[in-house]
Structure formats: C-alpha cells, structure tokens
C-alpha cells in the first residue's frame, strides 16, 4: 500500500517574507513523529528557525501526537534539530547576523527514500505596503482571468 505524497507548506511564509535563498535540510525526529508526518498531521504555521551552539533548530513546528502511540508519544511543539552541511550552516548564520535576514521553514515533505525533509529559506520580512500590493496584484490577476474566460 503506497501512501499519498506528503507535502506540507507554510503559506504565510511567501506572503510575509521575500524568500532570498532556499536549502533542503534533514530533520531529527522520533518514531511517533515520523508516523504522524506520514499521516499528514503536521503544521508549519508560526514556525521559525534559530541557531544554538552552531546548530540550526526549528521552533514551533506542530506535529500532532501519534494516535496509536503509547506513553512514549512525543511533545507536539518541541524544538527539532535540522541537518545541513557546515558550509550551508555558515552561509545561513552569516545571513542572519550580517544582513538581518531570518530563516523560515517553507515546506515539509518526505523524499523518495522515506526520509522527512524541510525546505528552509533565508528570508527578508515584507513591509505592510508590500503585502497590500501583492494582494492587489493577485486580485487583478484573478479579475483578468475571469474576464478572459467569458
């Protein structure tokens, strides 16, 4: 039995931030966490990344408790370590310290080998008027599509 592909997205990330550069990172999970992700029970809303002791961690990622788990079940919103190469970690850390960027998880997926991966992006926060402008363009595009369908 093959499960449907898991592709959990952070829709707010593209609206609130201008994504500069993306990286695919592995994530350290427990057994019940990966089972919940395979069932699609995860959320990236209000999730962000931070550095601690030279390692990249993701905070506020919600992975629901596994329904069939016992007393060994995981905490839903614990901090989880991300796995990147040293070169990528240095580049991300430099970007956050020097340029004032932030690191935002954009997507959580399971690759062809069955491993959970997180796509993180070096991002710059958008101003309120940029967000309004993006919404206006989206509405205009939608109206144009409606006009051409008729």
UniProtKB/Swiss-Prot annotation:
Family: Belongs to the SmpB family.
A GO molecular-function annotation: RNA binding
Biological-process GO terms, alphabetical: trans-translation
Species in which this protein is naturally found: Bacteroides fragilis (strain ATCC 25285 / DSM 2151 / CCUG 4856 / JCM 11019 / LMG 10263 / NCTC 9343 / Onslow / VPI 2553 / EN-2)
PROSITE patterns associated with the record: SSRP
Protein name: SsrA-binding protein
GO CC entries: cytosol
Keywords linked to the UniProt accession: Cytoplasm, RNA-binding
Main location: cytoplasm
Pfam families for this protein: SmpB (PF01668)
Function: Required for rescue of stalled ribosomes mediated by trans-translation. Binds to transfer-messenger RNA (tmRNA), required for stable association of tmRNA with ribosomes. tmRNA and SmpB together mimic tRNA shape, replacing the anticodon stem-loop with SmpB. tmRNA is encoded by the ssrA gene; the 2 termini fold to resemble tRNA(Ala) and it encodes a 'tag peptide', a short internal open reading frame. During trans-translation Ala-aminoacylated tmRNA acts like a tRNA, entering the A-site of stalled ribosomes, displacing the stalled mRNA.
Location relative to the cell: Cytoplasm
InterPro entries: SmpB (IPR023620), SsrA-bd_prot (IPR000037), SsrA-bd_prot_CS (IPR020081)
């Amino acid at each position: 039995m093959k499960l449907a592909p898991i592709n959990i997205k952070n829709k707010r990330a593209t609206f609130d931030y201008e994504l500069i550069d993306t990286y695919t990172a592995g994530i350290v999970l427990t057994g019940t966490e990966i089972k919940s992700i395979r069932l699609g029970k995860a959320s990236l809303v209000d999730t962000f990344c931070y550095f601690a002791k030279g390692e990249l961690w993701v905070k506020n990622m919600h992975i629901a408790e596994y329904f069939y788990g016992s007393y060994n079940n995981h905490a839903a919103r614990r901090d989880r370590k991300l796995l990147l190469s040293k070169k990528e970690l240095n580049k991300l850390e430099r970007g956050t310290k020097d340029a004032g960027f932030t690191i935002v998880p954009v997507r959580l997926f399971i690759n062809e080998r069955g491993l959970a991966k997180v796509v993180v992006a070096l991002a710059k926060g958008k101003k309120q008027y940029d967000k309004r402008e993006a919404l206006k363009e989206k509405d205009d595009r939608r109206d144009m599509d409606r006009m051409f369908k008729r």
